[in-house]
């Protein structure tokens, strides 16, 4: 994925060095966009191996509306451990906002179910939007949503998705986000009778942590390989019925993992 390497290089060359919430320090740019045509392969990094199991289980966890890490722990996923409390709770994070956004009248809005309904009944709508950024509840979240709003677009039988990510940890987080939302787009396309189109990733504060510079430069020495193909069980027609076993990634050849510390 040359597109991702171009982002790394751009931020290293043109970013501004800034202090940040974690005290680590970053080099960042404000405003950057990447586009991935999902017909050209599944956009997962080949210049370092990603833990696909974590990506899939996290997405299924979001779609369940879950906000406790028990499901993730049961499936060997540790990416949320640093933020959970002693009971494994994270507060009203992504899954809660996606599936149970609290309305002023006491109702809870299932944004994902509403999205699916609109894709069936009014696919030309400009309101095919899901938001995880709820100002009334941000302070109750263990970590406010970094990937905070996404919109779908249907044209010529293809479903495209654009994600706005307010805060983008380029070395560790962004590769996960690309693969996760690409997969979500493919899943929703399948259950709505559409073909996958593009995934467009729009970044706000796009940053590389100062203790990731060496790792980023190592990754830039590597050559991207052909993208793998994601196969999804064609029998699944209900978005909320997908299981881990319904996904198979063929042809994934990647360079070794590059370890880097997480800024909490």
Curated annotation (Swiss-Prot):
Its EC number is 2.1.1.45. InterPro entries: Thymidate_synth/dCMP_Mease (IPR045097), Thymidate_synth/dCMP_Mease_dom (IPR023451), Thymidate_synth/dCMP_Mease_sf (IPR036926), Thymidylate_synthase (IPR000398), Thymidylate_synthase_AS (IPR020940). (6R)-5,10-methylene-5,6,7,8-tetrahydrofolate binds at residues 51, 169, 263. It catalyses: dUMP + (6R)-5,10-methylene-5,6,7,8-tetrahydrofolate = 7,8-dihydrofolate + dTMP. Belongs to the thymidylate synthase family. Bacterial-type ThyA subfamily. CDD domains: TS_Pyrimidine_HMase (cd00351). DUMP binds at residues 21, 126-127, 166-169, 177, 207-209. It comes from the Bacteria. GO terms for molecular function: thymidylate synthase activity. Catalyzes the reductive methylation of 2'-deoxyuridine-5'-monophosphate (dUMP) to 2'-deoxythymidine-5'-monophosphate (dTMP) while utilizing 5,10-methylenetetrahydrofolate (mTHF) as the methyl donor and reductant in the reaction, yielding dihydrofolate (DHF) as a by-product. This enzymatic reaction provides an intracellular de novo source of dTMP, an essential precursor for DNA biosynthesis. Keywords: Cytoplasm, Methyltransferase, Nucleotide biosynthesis, Transferase. This is Thymidylate synthase. Homodimer. It holds the Pfam family Thymidylat_synt. Signal peptide: none annotated. Pathway: Pyrimidine metabolism; dTTP biosynthesis. One of its GO terms (cellular component) is cytosol. One of its GO terms (biological process) is dTMP biosynthetic process. PROSITE patterns: THYMIDYLATE_SYNTHASE (PS00091). It is found in: Cytoplasm. The active site is at residue 146.
